[in-house]
Design a protein with these regions (language model features):
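A periodicity- and composition-biased signal for non-globular, repetitive helical segments
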Residues: 8-9, 37
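Positively charged n-region of N-terminal signal peptides that target proteins for export
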Residues: 1-5
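Bacterial N-terminal signal peptides
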Residues: 9-18
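Noncatalytic, solvent-exposed loop/strand surfaces
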Residues: 22-229
Length: 229
């Protein structure tokens, strides 16, 4: 399997530098604890190099635009082969950079098209005590035990044509795992019981966004007017 240091090694090395004396806060979902991209840590380094402000660096196989999530001493991330046929979750020890779990979750015989500026592992996972929830869009969603890496449940029945590749990250609200699917054929929001993976509710949405199948606009529309002096 092809192994590359970018983008994940660079992200992990840059984000998990040594902070003294207190460790940085957990980062459990896309854009952090409150989903707003705000980090409360202060006095962080502004420069990095191979010998400066890097505690460890770990190469991760595959290609992914998803963000790592952090809880306690674990850093979890998703990755995929560049052809989209193998989709994985990886857990790294926060203090040492050692890989704890490297789990191939889904195999996809005929991956959908994915734009070159996207990846087959772009949705960021969401983690809570004892469980992590990962999704790759239509190819599959899974809940894992963070200690053992065991798959607690999975779903592969949310089908849509992602057109340019999946990118929507899940969120947790109370007992629900909520996901958004914006396909060119089907669009919907679905809420799952986070403990069992069973569907609690699903809301369909219109797919009329005035694009043709080739991606070219059906018509030109003016959405705003601006005066510039």
């Amino acid at each position: 399997m092809k192994r590359t240091s970018l983008p994940f090694a660079a992200i992990l090395a840059g984000a998990l530098f040594s902070i003294s004396p207190a460790r940085a806060a957990d980062w459990p979902q896309f854009r952090g604890p409150d989903g707003d991209g705000h980090a409360a840590a202060k006095g962080l380094p502004l420069n990095w190099s191979e010998s400066q402000n890097v505690k460890w660096k770990t190469p991760i196989h595959g290609k992914a635009w998803s963000s790592p999530v952090i809880l306690g001493d674990q850093v979890w991330l998703t990755t995929a082969t560049e052809d989209g046929k193998e989709l994985s979750a990886v857990c790294v020890n926060r203090d040492s950079g050692k890989i704890i779990h490297d789990l191939k979750l889904f195999e996809v015989a005929n991956p959908q098209f994915c734009h070159k500026f996207n990846s087959y592992a772009s949705p960021t996972p969401v983690i809570e005590q004892g469980r992590i929830y990962v999704t790759f869009g239509s190819p599959g969603t899974a809940c894992l035990d963070t200690k053992t890496g065991k798959v607690l449940w999975e779903r592969r029945d949310f089908v849509c044509n992602h057109f340019r590749g999946a990118g929507s990250s899940p969120i947790i609200f109370e007992n629900l795992l909520i996901m958004n699917y914006d396909g060119s054929d089907f669009q919907f929001i679905v809420a799952l019981d986070k403990k069992t993976g069973k569907t609690v509710w699903r809301k369909e949405r219109s797919v009329d966004y005035r694009d043709l199948k080739d991606g070219k606009p059906e018509e030109v529309m003016d959405f705003y007017n601006a005066s510039i002096a």
